[in-house]
Amino acid sequence: MMLQRSCIVLFFSLFLLVPQMVFSMLNRTLLLIPHPDPELVAYQVQWKVNASITRRQALDTTDQAGSTPCITGNPIDDCWKCDPNWPNNRQGLADCGIGFGQYALGGKGGQFYFVTDSSDDDAVNPKPGTLRYGVIQEEPLWIVFPSNMMIKLKQELIFNSYKTLDGRGANVHIVGGGCITLQYVSNIIIHNIHIHHCYQSGNTNVRSSPTHYGFRTKSDGDGISIFGSKDIWIDHCSLSRCKDGLIDAVMGSTGITISNNFFSHHNEVMLLGHSDHYEPDSGMQVTIAFNHFGEKLIQRMPRCRRGYIHVVNNDFTQWEMYAIGGSGNPTINSQGNRYTAPTNPFAKEVTKRVETPDGDWKGWNWRSEGDILVNGAFFVASGEGAEMRYEKAYSVEPKSASFITQITFHSGVLGVGGRNNNLGMWTTTGSEGTSGLDSYNDYTDEMSGAGSTNRLSFSVLVFLLSSISYLVVFTSSTQMFML
């Protein structure tokens, strides 16, 4: 009996040695399950777009008073903007998502948290009322801004799960160190926020929850970094001039929708996928819809590795190198976009297979369906039998490309301040003003902001779990022996 008790005590002691974050990380990683039928999700997006356009056309025909109808043809905006009572039903926004990120709940069902303090003086002990204090809480929160504010971050803003950043009704800018980090979390909605002039930070402690803070290595300086996360929706934001990417999603992240955003003044706009050889990124599924890729963009709109990427009804107004690139055999489904090529005769191609021989990418699944190609733009499709596989008899066709101006007219931040970031307020030299134009390197194995306290090597994890299993078996055997 004494031996049995000793084993039980040892079992629980070893169990307590395993940090809570390891189990949290393990559980979240196991839940990064892709949708079983991505083509169905793509079909549903196009169906919703065409349904909104049909309603808009019907209103144009029947409207006798000459007033402008609310319906725009954009199914996300039509879902909430047509409700005159939306300020009193803010959480209804969570029901308006489309695509792979449509299940992002954000803080729906939770309390409202009001950001009343724009300061960010302490990344370990943030003050109540600050944005940092709100995003680290455990419970669902719908975070709103009662006034205009400029939030200058000192370090990465690390989110906890089930949070909505709702900037409607205010002019909210997030700039500085970091900026936004979504690491091993789920159910995040970021809506109507200016995000720009983000630079590298780190090599210090940062709090990620009310009960945990840890040392963070140097971040890459992304506008929004999505790392091992799911059910993420980024809508109606204006992003520009960050050190690395404007939005980067890596390490098996999936269930993401990036919609109605305005991108400008940046080099490497969007990276989807950690590396060509990182298997979990094969399950990455991202919808990129109704965005305006505006002036002074160079490349990566997006740059994909593995996964399934649905690019639908976006307006690409020139690029300097290419618009959509990839490696590692991603599936790219381009539907109903408008691609306007630059004047450079050597940069007319929409697509780029990055550092991949022709013989390797010929079988990759890249298609263009219903896209509008302007100023000599051309899309190089690939995939054996792609036309037969992709042009099946859908009842929905991407006819909405001709409505691109209408669908993307309100891209970026709505209301106060407009969609353009007020670039005149910022210098273009030094760490806070780095535009990102000097960053051409791809991601390396040293991922941004991944602090050592948040990681436990796989071998150590296996050892601990194996030890626990061994003790359970040993205890049972001892009990049987004593009987």
UniProtKB/Swiss-Prot annotation:
Record GO biological process:
pectin catabolic process
Any idea which residues are catalytic in this one? R300
Q: Translocase: is it a keyword of this entry?
A: no
**Can you tell which superkingdom this protein's organism belongs to?**
Eukaryota
Is Transcription regulation one of the keywords UniProt gives this record?
Answer: no
**Reactions performed catalytically:** Eliminative cleavage of (1->4)-alpha-D-galacturonan to give oligosaccharides with 4-deoxy-alpha-D-galact-4-enuronosyl groups at their non-reducing ends
Signal peptide bounds: 1-24
Report the enzyme's class at the first EC level. Answer: lyase
The residues that carry sugar chains are N27, N50
The note on cofactor binding and number reads:
Binds 1 Ca(2+) ion. Required for its activity.
| Needed co-factor(s) | Ca(2+)
Question: Where, by residue number, does Ca(2+) bind?
Answer: D220, D244, D248
Biological pathway: Glycan metabolism; pectin degradation; 2-dehydro-3-deoxy-D-gluconate from pectin: step 2/5
The alphabetical list of record keywords is: Calcium, Glycoprotein, Lyase, Metal-binding, Signal
Q: What is the E.C. number?
A: 4.2.2.2
- The protein here is known as Probable pectate lyase 12
According to its UniProt entry, this protein's organism is Arabidopsis thaliana
